[in-house]
């Protein structure tokens, strides 16, 4: 499935900012992607030193900051995003989704839609890059909406998509 339609979305701001980073990738081997490392510097996270360290939370934090919101404390920990914004029962465009992962860790990204069984998640460190992946709905532990400063953007909505593409089972 192609997600090119996301480039035409005018909001919410987190989706617009996330799409600017689409396709950012880890560098294979000993080297690191300086773009990913710069996100940590911009956020003041001095202990983040290499892109082989899980960076889904780093991606969400830089997007949230650039969209004008305050990231959560210890933003690299995916499960900490359960405290961001307001809890929702239905995921809509731009909502932050927090997932479980084997071993007790988590994963975090932005909702761009859903099919019958999966959320379509725009996130970092999904196959070592920023892209959209299908993640099983039953792994989602939190749906969080940005704390809009004026009003919710008019295009924040539920987006139903076709069940197309591989199912992500381990986002590291």
Predicted regions, residues:
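...with weaker cross-activation on analogous glycine-rich loops/strands in unrelated enzymes
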Residues: 7-12, 61, 69-131
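Glycine-rich catalytic cores of cysteine/serine-nucleophile enzymes that process amide/ester linkages
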Residues: 30-53, 100-141
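Short alpha-helical interface elements
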Residues: 42-47, 84-89, 146
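Intrinsically disordered, low-complexity, charged/polar segments
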Residues: 133-161
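Intrinsically disordered regions, especially transient/low-confidence alpha-helical propensity segments
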Residues: 2, 36, 52, 73-81, ...
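N-terminal capping segments
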Residues: 1-69, 152-172
């Amino acid at each position: 499935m192609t997600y090119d339609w996301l480039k035409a979305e005018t909001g919410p701001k987190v989706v617009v900012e996330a799409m600017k980073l689409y396709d950012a990738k880890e560098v294979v081997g000993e080297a690191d992607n300086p773009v990913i490392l710069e996100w940590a510097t911009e956020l003041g996270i001095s202990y983040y030193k290499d892109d082989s360290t899980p960076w889904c939370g780093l991606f969400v934090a830089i997007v949230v900051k650039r969209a004008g919101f305050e990231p959560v404390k210890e933003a690299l920990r995916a499960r900490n995003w359960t405290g961001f914004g307001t809890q929702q029962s239905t995921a809509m465009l731009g909502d932050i989704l927090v997932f479980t992962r084997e071993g007790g860790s988590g994963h975090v990204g932005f909702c761009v839609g859903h099919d019958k069984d999966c959320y379509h998640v725009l996130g970092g460190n999904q196959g070592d890059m920023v892209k959209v992946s299908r993640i099983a709905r039953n792994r989602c532990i939190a749906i969080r909406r940005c704390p809009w400063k004026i009003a919710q953007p008019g295009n924040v909505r539920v987006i139903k998509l076709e069940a197309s593409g591989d199912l992500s089972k381990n986002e590291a």
